[in-house]
Curated annotation (Swiss-Prot):
Subunit structure as annotated in this protein's UniProt entry: In the cytoplasm, prematurely activated/folded ScpA forms a stable non-covalent complex with ScpB.
Residue span(s) of the pro-peptide: 26-214
GO function terms (MF aspect): cysteine-type peptidase activity
Official protein name in the record: Staphopain A
Gene transcribed to yield this protein: sspP
Catalytic-site annotation from UniProt: C238, H334, N355
């Protein structure tokens, strides 16, 4: 992790949907979604590998239920909507497959992300990995009975409607200290919006499944007082956000804030030097010590059992990640917080993570050290600092 980062080269992506051809399951009498005005998203291709589709259908309910329990939600029924993919402006896919998770009201509650294993970095032996988080669920719910295209770049995600204006709907941490335009024009000559097929992301593709049994069988362990009090904006303070939320949780307080943490450690920095500074592991450990904790550095990902024991003992864990796509730029190194862990009804072990860019938690296979995040990048979990 570095204090000062060179400028990150923005990668423009297009976020569009790709689905597996499937019979209109909405006609099934067992599907009772009230919503009939579906979100229509322009797509290029509706194909999804059989292995990916089967994995999503087999495991989505277990992963979703783990987050429901973390959020203290009641038992519910869910199904999958039509899946989608994310493309760059040149129409090259980012390689992931995304499945909306629908509730019985026809709204999207979560997004299932299935990624091919990154052989060079991943410790997982499986062909694909699966993660679940809220991601773009609230955004998609706002466009019922509309036809849209979704674009993304380093500034965030944009919805493009019939007027070909891209409205910013979800910000991600960005580089430039400038005000974002609420609408932007699509680049001239760009044909990403001229996609021939459409996907109905709120259309059920199978019968709804109750998570009653799954809910009762799952083991959930969480830092009792962990809450998302603030999220990261246009700065390099991921470690500050991570430590402040972990300490707020383990001390059951609201007094820690990312900016104050960064100011404590960098009292003499001003302007953009302060705004875009980061922290080293040594600085993170030092700050924990000044707050009455004894953080320890572990040069690897924590195991499921380690997370389970530390969380039970009210000791917070910071994830230290290295971006797989590029080792250069502002977010080449990134810190995240461990919220807890879960053992699913199928026996699979997962770790619950909070990324300071997000307003929700995400699941992570406990045997996979590559974490997909909400801006399309992947981070290799190479070290941990535990004891906050």
């Amino acid at each position: 992790m570095k204090r000062n980062f060179p400028k990150l080269i923005a990668l423009s992506l297009i976020f569009s949907l790709s689905v597996t051809p499937i019979a209109n399951a909405e006609s099934n009498s067992n599907i009772k979604a009230k919503d009939k005005k579906h979100v229509q998203v322009n797509v290029e291709d509706k194909s999804v590998p059989t292995d990916v589709r089967n994995l999503a259908q087999k495991d989505y309910l277990s992963y979703v239920t783990s987050l429901d329990k973390i959020y203290n939600k009641e038992k519910a029924s869910y199904t999958l909507g039509e899946p989608f993919k994310i493309y760059k402006f040149n129409k090259k896919s980012d390689g992931n497959y995304y499945f909306p998770v629908l509730n019985t009201e026809g709204n999207i509650d979560y997004i299932v992300t299935i990624s091919p294993k990154i052989t060079k970095y991943s410790s997982s032996s499986s062909k694909y990995t699966i993660n679940v988080s809220p991601f773009l669920s609230k955004v998609l719910n706002q466009y019922k009975d509309q036809q849209i295209t979704i674009l993304t770049n380093s500034k965030g995600y944009y919805v493009v409607t019939q007027n070909h204006k891209a409205k910013l709907v979800l910000k991600t941490p960005r580089l430039e200290d400038k005000k974002l335009k609420k609408t932007e024009s699509i680049p001239t000559g760009n044909n990403v919006t001229q996609l021939k097929q459409k996907a109905s992301v709120t259309m059920p593709t199978s019968q709804f499944k109750s998570n009653n049994y799954t809910y009762n069988e799952q083991y959930i362990n969480k830092l009792e007082n962990f809450k998302i009090r603030e999220t990261q904006g246009n700065n390099g303070w991921c470690a500050g956000y991570t430590m402040s939320e972990l300490l707020n949780a383990t001390y059951n307080t609201n007094k820690y804030h990312a900016e104050a943490v960064m100011r404590f450690l960098h009292p003499n920095l001003q302007g953009q030097r302060f705004q875009f500074t980061g922290l080293t592991p040594r600085e993170m450990i030092y700050f924990g010590q000044t707050q009455g904790r004894s953080p320890q550095l572990l040069n690897r990902m924590t195991t499921y059992n380690e997370v389970d024991n530390l969380t039970k003992n009210n000791k917070g864990i910071a994830v230290l990640g290295s971006r797989v796509e590029s080792r250069n730029g502002m977010h080449a190194g990134h810190a995240m917080a461990v919220v807890g862990n879960a053992k699913l009804d199928n026996g699979q072990e997962v770790i619950i993570i909070w990324n300071s860019w997000d307003n929700g938690f995400m699941t992570q296979d406990a045997k996979n050290n590559v974490i997909p995040v909400s801006n399309g990048d992947h981070y290799r979990w190479y070290s941990s600092i535990y004891g906050y």
